[in-house]
Structures are given as structure tokens and as C-alpha cells.
Amino acid sequence: MNAEPSAGPGIRVVTVPYSDPHVDAVLPEGVVRVGPAQGPSPWLDPAYLAAHAGGVDVVHLHSGYGHLPEDEVVSWAETLRRTGVPLVLTVHQLRDPQQATRRRHDAHLEALLATAEVVLTLTPGAADEIAERFGRTAIVVAHPSIAEPVPGLGAERGLVGLALRTPCAAVPDPAGLVRAALSGAVNGGGRLRVFLDDGVEPPPVFAAGDSLEYRPRKADSWPAQLQELHAVVLPECCGTHSPELEVCRDVGTRVVAPSCGWFADQWADVVTYDNDEERGLDPVSLDAAVAAALTRPAPRPADRAWRAEQRAAVRAVHAQVYAQVVADRAG
């Protein structure tokens, strides 16, 4: 890639999804984001893509395609190649935790990585995995800040959080997670707060008490709920990166992360426990990791000046990538 190109004003970029915290954080100033702002994005329809490709310069795919059958993503990639519009692909997940097996996502990645002009990802470990599995070189671009701490809102020392969302294959044993996290919290001199999404019931074997409480998880104030914790457990047995981890870095909450994926690459200051798709949850490991997390002071919220510099650098990389793929197409 040529040195230091900048995104010219008016480069028209389709972002899929149109908007989310990460997409908004990385989009350079001066770029024209092309809608419509709806989900699923109509740009994932090959017919829509073919009909409207003349009005855009770049398609940048982040996520939002996991629901599509394998052959539809292959057809979409073929259509994009025929239009000549360059694809920039950010690989957020190498194993989609929302899917029961890895087969569909692997097929999606194979088609998309074969089509993309430029591949981005969030950690060196993920870039190495992409090179090993798919033969593509990915540019590592850090996940930028997506939250700010609430002024004056303190954390309770020893308070551990665990969120139980809509049941999925990535969390096959929520009761086992609660049991091990509760044991670790108590062994570390603390207590456990379990957050429940709407419609999710607490595991029936655990009643609330002095060491265990249940709270509704509030999407609009989730960063503040995380800020009140000393530590939080990420429960998935599969996945690659976590935006929730970045929120915790921003607000100053320690993360207890599973051994799957590249969470420790994303933020070195995590405590890891054994939980992956092949071997499952090791409850003794989670118990010990939670207790160990409580022996350490909660991390300070990420320095806002450093986070602002990081975001500017991330946007500069995206501007450079967009300018380069547009120039390559014109040449």
C-alpha cells in the first residue's frame, strides 16, 4: 500500500451494518456513508447491490450477514466482483458465537476473504489465524473506544458481574457458569450480580441471597452497569473479539475472559479461564480466575487522551485504505 494516502472528501462508502458503535468509531471524517439505515442491510441483496453499485465507491463489510445461507453470501461476493466495487472486510469473528456450529461462518469467510481487496482485523492473533486458515494478510487495527465512564459513578469492590442473554450454543451451561462464578466471587471475598436480558429466567437452582443477586440488563445503560463492577465474566465458549471488553477497558472494570478466541490479545490486562468449544467450561478454572481477579485492584479507566489518539489513528488507517482501493480501481 502506498504511503500515507488520505481519504478524499466525498468517497462514498457502504458500511454493513450501516451503523453500530464500532462502525461509527472507525469511519473517517469526510467519507459519505451510504444508506439506507436499516437492518438487515439491503446491500446484502445481490439484486440491490447490482442495481445501486454505480452510486458507491467502496463496500465495507463488518457484520450483519450471519443469517444468510452460505450460497447467498457466495452469490453476493460474485455479484460484487462483477460490479468492480472494491470490498473492504473487517473480520470481527473467526467463530461466530451466535451460530451453533462453525460451518456456515467458515463458508462465509472463505467467500468474502477471496473477494476482499483489503482485510482488517482487531488483533495480531486473529491476523495470524486468518493467514494460516485462509491465506490472506490482514491489517491489524485496534478496536477503538466505544464508551466513556460516568463521572462520579464508583465500583463496588468485590462485585462480580455475569450477563445471561438469550440462550445460544456459545453458553450451553448457564447454571454451571453461575455456580463457578459465584464460588469464585465468594472465595475472593465478594459477591455475584447476574444480569438477565428480557425473557431470560435465572437458573432455577440458585436463589438470590447475600452473595447472589439478579438484575435486568439495560442495553441503554449497560456501560454504567459494567462500571459499577469490580470484574465481569465473559461467558462464551466460542468467539474471537468482544466489544464488551472494550467498554470495560473504557470504564475501568476487570475482565475475566474465556480461553477461546483472542480476548487476551485484545487487552493484555484480562484474567483468563478455561472455556472453549472443544473442552467446554472448566469450573475450577473459572472459580480460580474470578477469585484472582478480585485480588487485584480494578483497572483505571482508559486514559481519554490516549483513546482519542488511538481513534484518530484507527480512522487514519481506514481513510488510507479507502483512498487506496479507490485509486487502485481508477488505475
PLM regions and their residue ranges:
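A charged, aromatic-enriched C-terminal amphipathic alpha-helix characteristic of glycosyltransferases
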Residues: 277-330
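Nucleotide-activated donor-binding/catalytic signature segment of Leloir-type glycosyltransferases, i.e.
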Residues: 198-224, 231
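Conserved catalytic-core segment of nucleotide-activated headgroup transferases in glycan assembly
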Residues: 155-205
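Short N-terminal targeting/anchoring amphipathic segment
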Residues: 42, 48-71, 88-90, 235
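Membrane-proximal helix-turn-helix segments that form the acceptor-binding/catalytic region
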Residues: 75-86, 99-118
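Short hydrophobic beta-strand element within catalytic cores of glycosyltransferases
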Residues: 254-260, 264
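Donor nucleotide-sugar binding/catalytic pocket of nucleotide-sugar-dependent glycosyltransferases
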Residues: 114-131, 135-150
